[in-house]
UniProtKB/Swiss-Prot annotation:
Annotated glycosylation sites: 429
Family: Belongs to the glycosyltransferase 22 family. PIGZ subfamily.
Name of the protein in its database record: GPI mannosyltransferase 4
Native source organism of the sequence: Eremothecium gossypii (strain ATCC 10895 / CBS 109.51 / FGSC 9923 / NRRL Y-1056)
GO biological process, any: GPI anchor biosynthetic process
Gene that encodes the chain: SMP3
One Pfam family cited in the UniProt record for this chain: Glyco_transf_22
Top-level lineage group: Eukaryota
Membrane topology: Multi-pass membrane protein
Disulfide bond annotation, renumbered to this chain: none
Function: Alpha-1,2-mannosyltransferase involved in glycosylphosphatidylinositol-anchor biosynthesis. Transfers a fourth mannose to trimannosyl-GPIs during GPI precursor assembly. The presence of a fourth mannose in GPI is essential in fungi.
Associated pathway: Glycolipid biosynthesis; glycosylphosphatidylinositol-anchor biosynthesis
PANTHER family on file: GLYCOSYLTRANSFERASE, GPI MANNOSYLTRANSFERASE 4
GO MF entries: alpha-1,2-mannosyltransferase activity
Top EC class for this record: transferase
């Protein structure tokens, strides 16, 4: 089959996968849709720590630009959560596909290289499973690809005497917006900006002035928007707040610490798989996109909190740097087959099944009056899906190493969602007992991978649990236990507990 046909088939598959309710990571909702739905739809729900005024570690400006128009339109047409999620994911999909296509034209030196890069960019599982999801990392990827592509133009045309004042102004806007979206954006643009300055801007001061002016104007606008959004009397500079927070290792420890080699040895293989073999002979020059990859990975590896999604910009930038026509050290045909097999497997795991039942269960629970929902051993539920204007959301707290429910208002017996995260069964028993004693209608939502532990609620604690709903399409990869085969059971269930 011709590569062009395979490419278009994969693009169609990626679009369909983008519409699946898979749930890759809580931040795809908590750092974007959750807070914006509260702003635009007037809902009540989870307010992540980053968006609490005492931290003010995330900017609202990029969210208004990338999600605001779609969500305002959804509000005007009174769209439900399925339409809202689908609209945002379709938007993310088309932005990525169109932008990477343009970037390939700017970066690719020959028609064959552009065609091969377009094939790789279209067949990575990242398109449907990550890039179409509402991550701040997805926005970072779009901005990084756009900025690197324009820097390539500036450097290439600069040799012919072009000044590119307007493009420099656009670059200033993109760089500022990228920093306010994620402070890690500086890492991806570090080396490319140094090269661009040395090869172009040190001789074109007018263009450099345009870049700096647009950077300052955009930064000022973002600061103004955030200051209004957080309602503080002092100016809010979210990238600075975020950087200061992440430079404190005690803060990072609350989110999980990893060895500094995690990005290189774990996260890159997870995102690129056999695609890393393309580096063996398939990269003949240190291109600007490749410099961005090196710069980004090196910078992010300095911090001990390392997740695969932090490296999303590396995927398109690396694939744009590959010249498959020069691949000699490994078989091209075999490598491409491994590439397609890897991405086919990962798109099913991450794009279709991963934590999918959480969103499915929320849609189901939305159809009836909400009493008390207790979520146990799942990802944090994105409560915006419930579209509830009177919701109370609470979770556990720690006193030393002891996990407790001190901050859970036990007197709220309606419109209450409790995220117990991965707490022990004793705390689950205590929580259920408190609400049942108060006469609450209690729903317990748990993955089937912990069904044996769920059964202890009846055997050990005497609860009467009745399964009200079950979906089999749910992969829980967080509680796998090789000594317990039942932990590999797919599915998620909603129980009524009395």
């Amino acid at each position: 089959m011709r590569l062009a046909v395979i490419r278009y088939i994969w693009l169609l598959v990626a679009l369909l996968v983008a519409l699946e309710p898979a749930y890759v990571h809580p931040d795809e909702h908590m750092q974007s849709v959750e807070v914006m739905m509260q702003k635009i739809f007037g809902l009540r729900g989870t307010v992540p720590w980053e968006f609490q005024p005492e931290y003010a570690a995330r900017s609202f400006a990029p969210l208004w630009i990338f999600m605001g128009p779609a969500l305002v339109a959804a509000r005007l047409f009174n769209a439900g959560p399925r339409v809202v999620l689908g609209l945002l994911r379709i938007q993310g999909y088309f932005l990525y596909v169109s932008l990477t296509r343009v970037a390939v034209e700017l970066v690719g030196r020959t028609k064959l290289r552009r065609s091969m890069a377009a094939f790789l960019l279209s067949t990575t599982y990242v398109v449907g499973a990550f890039q179409s999801h509402t991550f701040s990392n997805s926005i970072e990827t779009l901005l990084a690809v756009a900025a690197v592509g324009l820097l390539e133009v500036v450097i290439a045309d600069g040799r012919a005497g072009h000044r590119h004042v307007r493009i420099s102004g656009v670059l200033g806007f993109l760089i500022a917006l990228g920093l306010f979206n994620r402070v890690t954006f500086a890492g991806y643009l570090g080396l490319p900006c140094i090269v661009a300055f040395w090869q172009f801007y040190r001789r074109q001061w007018r263009s450099l002035a345009a870049l700096l002016l647009c950077f300052l104007l955009t930064s000022g606008a973002c600061i103004w928007i955030d200051t209004l959004s957080y309602g503080t009397s002092e100016w809010v500079i979210t990238p600075l707040n975020n950087l200061l927070y992440n430079m404190d290792e005690e803060n990072l420890a609350q989110h999980g610490l990893h060895p500094r080699y995690t990005h290189i040895l774990v996260n890159l293989p997870m995102l690129l798989g056999p695609g890393l073999l393309f580096a063996l002979g398939g990269i003949q020059r240190l291109s600007l996109p490749l410099l961005s990859c090196v710069s980004g990975v090196a910078t992010l590896s300095l911090f001990k909190h390392q997740e695969a999604r932090f490296l999303l910009p590396v995927v398109p930038l690396f694939l744009m740097s590959v010249d498959l026509t020069k691949l000699r050290t490994v078989s091209l045909t075999l490598t491409l087959k491994l590439w397609l097999a890897f991405n086919g497997l990962m798109v099913v795991i991450m794009g279709v099944g991963h934590q999918r039942g959480v969103i499915t269960a929320l849609h189901q629970l939305r159809e009836e009056p909400i009493g008390v929902q207790v979520w146990w051993k799942t990802y944090s539920p994105p409560t915006w899906v419930l579209m509830n204007e009177a919701l109370t959301v609470s979770t556990t707290n720690f006193v030393g190493d002891d996990e407790r429910i001190d901050e859970v208002p036990l007197d709220v017996t309606r419109n209450h969602v409790i995220d117990l995260k991965g707490c022990n069964i004793e705390l689950l028993n205590h929580t259920l007992s408190q609400f049942i004693a108060a006469g609450s209608k209690v729903h317990l939502i748990v993955p089937d991978s912990v069904a044996k532990k769920t059964a202890l609620l009846t055997k050990r604690y005497g609860f009467d649990i009745h399964r009200e709903f079950r979906t089999l399409v749910h992969l829980d990869l967080d509680h796998l236990d090789w000594s317990e085969p039942s932990s590999f059971t797919p599915g998620l269930s909603i129980y009524t507990v009395t």
